[in-house]
């Protein structure tokens, strides 16, 4: 790195800090913290434990955000001042030290950007993920299985816990359907970026002629809703089907009709669970899945979310990411516009950078609007 590159980097980082400031509005955070302090000093504050807890969580979240912002802003300012001073005094040792620390400075900005992206009301919640293959039989079933493995490896890398709720094996290979819950800090905040259609292009291992095939799978991600969130579900709007579990493992498989499928007739949302031997427990889990899906459905309606998955055939029109393995190797996300050549690593779960690029891109677009 030379002096020109370093000064350009500082300018770029300073612009990012200004953009972040416009989004998080630090002055408003300080006003809100003062309001919370006044509320906490009221004698009746602890009369409502639930409300007090919610206020405490809000205070912690916005305090941490403000602290990170101030630290980053101060680090950029200090770097500017120290560089100008060292440059004026021809202090090469200090200048080289600043050059070496440039990546660390850039990482601080990126971490702040990601913290800003994951500050939504539901981002800290667990995530319920469902993968559905599109038309194409064995090809699409295998692609859905590859995506499932990719997410399992991602969760392993991030220290998230995964609990499979429903697993339907494909007739020849792969899977027909899978639903699982991901538990961990900001699980939904990260995985919500995976909501959409994923497209695979490759030479088929199931085609003796070795022809190129295109497959699609949809990924649906919902926040796990708290029990105290009121989602009204009327019994008359539900159709319940019971069937024998067909997933991998478990001595109860194919012996009793313990698996449960629930269809919410007004929205067409379908959830199913065969995780437990008990039909009652599977029904309770499926109802929780339905509640989470309906909660996400209402959020999408209210926010007119652009990334809402439409009730249509899985195909070309709604894809968020393409994974091309032949005739060249590239993964490209249509939202961030970023392309990646490390296809093997990505399919092995190395998707955090892709997700973070999408989150930053979406926030930047929303800020421009």
From Swiss-Prot:
The keyword Flavoprotein does not apply. One of its GO terms (cellular component) is cytoplasm. The keyword DNA-binding does not apply. Methylated by PrmC. Methylation increases the termination efficiency of RF2. Belongs to the prokaryotic/mitochondrial release factor family. One of its GO terms (molecular function) is translation release factor activity, codon specific. Keywords: Cytoplasm, Methylation, Protein biosynthesis. InterPro entries: PCRF, Pep_chain_release_fac_I, Pep_chain_release_fac_I_sf, PrfB. Pfam families: PCRF, RF-1. It is found in: Cytoplasm. Peptide chain release factor 2 directs the termination of translation in response to the peptide chain termination codons UGA and UAA. This is Peptide chain release factor 2. The modification N5-methylglutamine is found at residue 251.
């Amino acid at each position: 790195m030379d002096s020109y590159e370093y000064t350009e980097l500082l300018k770029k980082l300073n612009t990012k800090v200004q953009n972040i400031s416009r989004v998080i509005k630090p002055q408003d955070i300080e006003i809100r913290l003062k309001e919370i302090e006044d509320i906490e000093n009221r004698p009746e504050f602890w009369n409502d434990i639930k409300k007090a807890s919610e206020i405490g969580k809000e205070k912690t979240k916005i305090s941490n955000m403000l602290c990170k912002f101030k630290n980053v802003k101060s680090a950029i300012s200090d770097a500017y001042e120290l560089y100008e001073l060292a440059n004026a005094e021809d202090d090469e040792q200090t200048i080289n030290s600043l050059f070496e620390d440039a990546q660390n400075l850039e990482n601080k900005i990126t971490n702040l950007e990601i913290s800003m992206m994951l500050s939504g009301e539901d981002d800290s919640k667990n995530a319920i993920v469902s993968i559905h293959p599109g038309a194409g039989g064995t090809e699409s079933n295998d692609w859905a299985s590859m995506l499932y493995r990719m997410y399992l490896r991602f969760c392993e890398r991030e220290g998230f816990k995964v609990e499979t709720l429903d697993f339907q094996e494909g007739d020849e290979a792969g899977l027909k359907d899978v639903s699982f819950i991901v538990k961990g800090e900001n699980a939904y905040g990260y995985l919500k970026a995976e909501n959409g259609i994923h497209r695979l292009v490759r030479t088929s291992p199931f085609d003796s002629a070795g022809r190129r095939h295109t497959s699609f799978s949809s990924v649906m991600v919902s926040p796990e809703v708290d029990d105290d969130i009121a989602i009204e579900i009327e019994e008359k709007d539900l159709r319940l089907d019971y069937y024998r579990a067909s997933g991998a493992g478990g001595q109860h498989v194919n012996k009793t009709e313990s698996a449960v499928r629930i269809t919410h007739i007004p929205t067409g949302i379908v959830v199913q669970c065969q995780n437990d031997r008990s039909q009652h427990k599977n029904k309770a889990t499926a109802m929780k899945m339905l509640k989470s899906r309906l909660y996400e459905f209402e959020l999408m309606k209210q926010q007119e979310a652009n990334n809402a998955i439409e009730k249509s055939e899985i195909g070309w029109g709604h894809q968020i990411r393409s994974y091309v393995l032949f005739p060249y190797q590239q993964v490209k996300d249509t939202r961030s516009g970023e392309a990646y050549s490390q296809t093997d690593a990505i399919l092995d779960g190395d998707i955090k950078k892709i997700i973070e690029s999408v989150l930053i891109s979406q926030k930047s677009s929303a800020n421009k609007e």
